[in-house]
Amino acid sequence: MAQWCADHQIAHDVYGEGALVQQFEKQVATMLGMEAAVFCITGTMAQATALRLACAGRSNRRVALHPTSHILKHERSNFQLLDHFHVLHIGDPFRPWTVDDLKALGEPIAAAQYELPMREIGGQLPAWDALNAIKTYCREQNIHLHMDGARMWEAACGYGKSLQDVATGFDSVYVSFYKDIGGMGGSMLLGSARFIAEAKIWMQRQGGNVFRRTPYVVSAAMQFEKRLAEMPTYFQRTVWLYELLKTYPQLTPNPATPHTNLLHLYVPLAAETANGIRNRIAKEHGIWLFGRAVNAALPGQCMFEWYVGDQLLQMPDDGVRKALDVLAKSIAASAK
């Protein structure tokens, strides 16, 4: 990082004001076809701010969130305890939600959030036409459509569309710079110039106007274009992996076909057993198969997440087959 800063004559920002920060905000906004952007220290703050502003602008505090929304699962009820907005659940917990789900709410809402892709259900994406139907309906009904785009870089590859194509029709977008991009942390909120100006005020009110953003921005900006260029390769490797998984009936991927370079694998074991197998394989074969298995709805079944990135790209095909062979044999032995 230090050498990159020296090579590019980077100077520190002061409370978010600095050439690098503004250049990076403009670069991402242009890529997504949005008017303006602001770098935010956390995605939690970015999304709560976006949805709060959407509600204030419509004098309606109701927001539609899928049951697997990060806001509901991982943010300690911030929307409720900090009095940002009220939540209505939308859609099937195990599927992307649709425009019919939106219509079925039966009451006016100010905003709806869509996560692209939906991490908690294996990186699923709505069909492209289904997403466009949601965009059209929200525009017609004056519903602020916000994207949780923490991993939208993956979504664009899954759709075979540009980032701008995916973002068009959303009133605001949040993106992350440590997921996929590999930065130290930080996020960006994008929208209209007026919306972002208001967001900056609210971020300052919440303690988000940190003195120096440069280290976070540098860690993302220095590798941003390179990481984006690698995303199609990750998706191609995922397609290859899905073909290989067809030969292992003990391993069930969700979704059934690749949507992005993220997937969940279901295996016929309790989570404790699967995690024990993971540890043993790591010790005996030097292969770390997954982070953590969690129990699924059915007894004796668990699932874990696979992210197809640099490590799986660098691993020889035969090495991947060996790892799956070892896992499949371990599952069979545990079932006896």
List the predicted regions and their residue ranges.
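PLP-dependent aminotransferase-like
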Residues: C55-A112
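Distinct, well-ordered alpha-helical segments
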Residues: L102, A156-Q164
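Conserved N-terminal alpha-helix of the aminotransferase class I/II PLP-enzyme fold
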Residues: M1-T42, A56, H66-L72, N78-Q80, ...
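Active-site C-terminal subdomain of aminotransferase-like
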Residues: E120, L125, T168-T260, L269
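Active-site phosphate-binding strand-loop segment of PLP-dependent enzymes
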Residues: R95-G149
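Conserved C-terminal alpha-helix-loop-beta "cap" of PLP-dependent enzymes
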Residues: R58, Q250-A335
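Hydrophobic beta-strand scaffold residues
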Residues: H86-V87, L145-M147, L289
